[in-house]
Structure formats: structure tokens, C-alpha cells
From Swiss-Prot:
InterPro entries reported in the protein's UniProt record: Ribosomal_bL17, Ribosomal_bL17_CS, Ribosomal_bL17_sf
Family affiliation: Belongs to the bacterial ribosomal protein bL17 family.
Gene Ontology biological-process annotations: translation
Pfam families: Ribosomal_L17
Taxonomic lineage: Bacteria, Pseudomonadati, Campylobacterota, Epsilonproteobacteria, Nautiliales
The UniProt record lists the keyword Lipid metabolism: no
Superkingdom to which the source organism belongs: Bacteria
Protein name from the UniProt record: Large ribosomal subunit protein bL17
Keywords: Ribonucleoprotein, Ribosomal protein
Signal peptide: none
Subunit-structure text: Part of the 50S ribosomal subunit. Contacts protein L32.
NCBIfam families: L17 (TIGR00059)
Amino acid sequence: MRHKHGYRKLGRVSEHRQALLRNLACDLIENGRIETTVPKAKELRKYVEKLITKSKNADLNTHRYVYSKLGSNERAKAATRKVIEEIAPKFENRKGGYTRIIKTRFRRGDAAEMCIIEFVGE
């Protein structure tokens, strides 16, 4: 039984899963919306919404926390700056639910259910 397991493994080992979520989070922050599979989007939603909630309090510790969660490269640095300076202030009066998942189609080839994940209000 998988009661209270807490997260999806997505068919990957932990390091690969962490890298996948970091890359998807950077893509979502940079572009505002991305298309991916439903299980990945549901995991990404939890990951990104925690970052945005933490980013509402913009201090040095927040910058370091978000940067560490998004990786340590130039892309993560730009994404950190964008989430703290642009995205988090838009959701200042919102207590959660910063993203929306819209189911779109079934992928040709493996029939995986695809969806679009985007920020609310964009």
C-alpha cells in the first residue's frame, strides 16, 4: 500500500527526478507555461508553489533558498531573480493556487496524457 507516500517517483532515480523538476521549474518560470505529462505537472505544481510562497518574503535567505532549489547555474540565477522580483509580487494577496493545469491531449506514441501548466493570471 502507498498510503501517505507523498510524491511520485516518475520512473527515475532521485538525482534524475530532482534534475527533471529543476529544469521543468526553470522552464515554467522563464516561459510562464509549458506542456508536459500530467504526473510531471502535478509534481511540478507542488515544487513551484512552495518556491513562490517562500519568495513572497524577499530577503537574502529567500534568494539563497530559491537559488539552491533551482540549481546553481546562470539559468537558475535568472529564474531566481524572475520569481522573486516579478512572479511572487503578483501573487502577494493570494494564499496558494498559483498554477493551473489544463489537460490537453494524449501523446502519440505512448498515449501519455498531456497537459499545460501555467501561472494563474497570465
